């Protein structure tokens, strides 16, 4: 039933059925339950070539076609796909993957730091502030999305087993990369946000509506900790390969 509001983004219809469903094309595509859906640039395609992954399908958008791979990892099939940046395209692609069989998803990608955290450090978001648009089409308006405890446990188990230090954080998910004003950054820091990225709350909302497991492993890139001197650093490039390796292991633990 639709909840009407003067502000359109705050309107919500809790009916999970839509005029266009993610599997409306009726493709002959049956994906594994486990999936790594990662914001890792060319690392996904590079790894797929390295291990001889099967390209079993494609997600076609107006600007880019995304290969969907299946690999064998420790004796079980895992779906592997590069996630597009931004809440709306990432939510659409993940919803499509779910429509074709994915049920347990781990994502990873970079985040900007609002606190003094070194580059290439691994973080586990446990709550996301919803300053993006896509989540409001999947879950009724609220200030935060809480991450699923089962996913958090699986992520942290793998990190601890490998002796990798991490922190649990609250993240600020925003659509406005160029609208992270000094006053807004300070406000988010006061609220407890340690990092900022562009998809977490949206993907958590997709998972909640569709009844699937989803979690995310973040790693640090640029820094907004000093409001007078933004530092892009090296965009967390040293952690890409390690992040993918960790996500494959996390997926196997689901």
Locations of the language-model features?
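Accessory terminal and edge-of-domain segments that mediate assembly/interaction
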Residues: 1-106, 112-254
């Amino acid at each position: 039933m639709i909840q009407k509001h003067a502000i359109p983004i705050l309107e919500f219809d809790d009916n999970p059925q839509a005029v266009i469903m993610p599997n409306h094309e009726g493709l002959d595509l049956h994906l594994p339950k486990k999936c790594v859906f990662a914001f890792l640039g060319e690392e996904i395609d590079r790894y797929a070539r390295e291990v001889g992954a099967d390209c079993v399908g494609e997600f076609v958008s107006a600007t880019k076609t995304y290969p969907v791979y299946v690999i064998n990892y420790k004796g079980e099939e895992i779906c592997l796909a590069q996630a597009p940046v931004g809440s709306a395209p990432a939510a659409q692609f993940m919803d499509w993957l779910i429509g074709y069989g994915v049920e347990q998803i781990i994502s990873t990608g970079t985040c900007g730091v609002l606190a003094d955290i070194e580059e290439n450090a691994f973080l586990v978001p446990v709550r996301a502030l919803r300053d993006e648009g896509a989540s409001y089409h999947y879950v009724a308006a609220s200030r935060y999305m809480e991450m699923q405890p089962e996913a958090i446990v699986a992520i942290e188990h793998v990190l601890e087993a490998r002796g990798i230090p991490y922190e649990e954080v609250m993240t600020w998910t925003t659509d406005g990369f160029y609208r992270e004003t000094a006053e807004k950054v300070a406000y988010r820091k006061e609220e407890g946000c340690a990092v900022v990225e562009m998809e977490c709350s949206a993907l958590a909302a997709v998972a909640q509506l569709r009844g699937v497991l989803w979690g995310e492993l973040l790693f640090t890139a640029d820094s907004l900790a000093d409001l007078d001197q933004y530092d892009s650093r090296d965009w967390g490039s040293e952690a890409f390969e390690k992040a993918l390796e960790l996500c494959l292991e996390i997926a196997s633990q689901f």
